[in-house]
A protein has these predicted regions:
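Non-transmembrane, aqueous-exposed alpha-helical and coiled segments at domain scale
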Residues: 1-459
């Protein structure tokens, strides 16, 4: 239950906020030189803080100190994501379980190893007895990512050895979390719909012989019905989002927390909190918000109309007035984001049969017309591309997945990468992460109370 707002605290904190903003302000000049703001180098690349075998993101080559753009590539344990996805699409098989095995174990499984892993995963999908009734239904939340983080922390209490960081126990915890995340998300959504939207409560249990993608669609829909094509498209989404290198914000948070020696549930909950941010996992929802503004204000058959409205978005006079075109550009990818390429390739047919063909075409126009506009604003022609968030929201919408489930479902895929990176951090690093901040305050003496001057206004 949301606590009653009396306004007392707000009347106190409101007037102080402006002074606090002034006190916290740091001049841009302090960020020159050695300071790596946002852990970024001056050319926008990430500061190198470690090495990893789990995932690799490639969008450019370095030649003579200069970035040379290349088509984007994403590797899981040295194997290109595109090859993994294409293999499963050609065979008509579900691939997320194999990807999870590959990321965790470091190698591709044999048929026997994969079948055994799927069997274990089917057992891991079951939530602890009373978990949904005692936690999710007793304390419902309007935000599913907060509910997911709280659920992860609560799993600590169900674990007989939650602080054991042996490889065997880390692997056990990882398999359980990978299995349970989709079940938690599906149940969180059912509870949220019931308590906050007044819908009937439908809790569906996972079916052992079904894949992660099939089970999720079955659990999240009141009638449990889904098509094979829907399940395979969601399976591809899970594979695409399973891992993205150690430097992305949520994975880095997980590794930084793991370096302190904390337990698995705390580290993963921290990653969930990071992914919630609109600059990270919440970006696909911002793309969909922007897209709705575009749809309402343009003629989709007129490129000039679309371009004019995109200019207004960049000017900050339309949409959310942020001055941003969401879904364009990436910290690493330059010429293409391989994840976006895969989504565009395989979502087209679903768009046609689900009645989203016009939306799909308009989104492509936003990409096509938006990139040169952003480049023009930046004053350079450095290659940039649509990122995965440009198309993932529309794919989720085509699958009937509501917007407040977008990021939790992202987490249900990325949990495999988080767990693999946590294991790697604990096995290989053995040193707490401890970056430095340069203090830029001026020194002064302690002023006795009688000599202090009151603020000019606190009313």
């Amino acid at each position: 239950m949301i606590e009653k707002n009396t306004g007392v605290l707000e009347r106190y904190t409101g007037p102080l906020s402006r002074r606090i903003q002034e006190e916290y302000a740091i001049g841009e000049s302090y960020y020159q030189g050695e300071v790596k703001r946002g852990l970024r180098n001056s050319d926008g690349t990430g500061v190198l803080v470690g090495v990893t075998k789990v995932g690799s993101v490639q969008g450019y080559l370095l030649q003579d100190g200069q970035r040379v753009p290349i088509p984007g590539q994403l590797y899981y344990r040295g194997i290109e994501l595109n090859d993994i996805v294409e293999a499963h699409r050609s065979a008509g098989t579900f691939g997320y379980e194999e990807v999870a095995y590959l990321l965790l174990m470091g190698y591709l499984p044999t048929r026997q190893e994969l079948d055994r892993f799927k069997e274990i995963m089917s057992q891991a999908r079951k939530l602890p007895e009373g978990f949904t009734e005692g936690l999710l239904m007793r304390h419902p939340s309007g935000n599913m990512m907060n509910e997911l983080a709280r659920s992860v922390l609560s799993l600590y209490s169900y674990d007989p050895a939650p602080d054991d960081t042996s490889i065997e126990n880390l692997l056990l915890q990882s398999v359980k979390l990978i299995g349970r995340f989709p079940s938690i998300v599906a149940n969180c959504y059912a509870v949220k719909r019931h308590y906050f939207q007044g819908d009937s409560l439908h809790i569906h249990f996972p079916v052992p012989e079904l894949s992660t993608a099939e089970n999720f669609l079955r659990m999240i829909r009141p009638d449990t019905n889904y098509t094979e094509e829907e399940a395979h498209l969601l399976d591809m989404m899970l594979m695409v989002h399973a891992e993205h290198g150690g430097g992305n914000n949520s994975t880095f948070v997980c590794r930084a927390m793991s370096s302190s020696g904390t337990d698995t549930y705390s580290a993963i909950a921290g990653a969930v909190g990071s992914l919630k941010g609109p600059l990270h996992g919440g970006a696909n929802a911002k793309v969909m918000e922007m897209f709705h503004y575009v749809k309402e204000n343009v003629d989709p058959r007129d490129d000039g109309s679309i371009r004019d409205y995109l200019v207004k978005l960049l000017d900050g006079t339309a949409g959310d007035r942020s001055g941003k075109l969401y879904g364009l550009g990436h910290a690493v990818y330059t010429m293409s984001d391989p994840r976006a390429v895969l989504l565009k390739k395989y979502a087209r047919h679903m768009a046609e049969i689900k009645g989203y063909a016009e939306d799909f075409a308009l989104l492509q126009k936003v990409e096509e017309l938006g990139i040169p506009l952003v480049q023009e604003r930046r004053g350079d022609d450095t290659p940039m591309c649509a990122n995965v968030d440009m198309y993932s929201g529309l794919v989720y919408a085509m699958l009937g997945i509501p917007q407040d489930v977008f990021t939790p479902l992202f987490a249900s895929a990325r949990i495999a990468g988080w767990c693999a990176n946590r294991m790697e951090e604990l096995i290989t690093c053995h040193r707490i992460m401890r970056p430095a901040y340069r203090a830029v305050t001026t020194h002064g003496r302690y002023v006795p109370m009688a000599e202090r001057t009151a603020p000019t206004s606190e009313e």
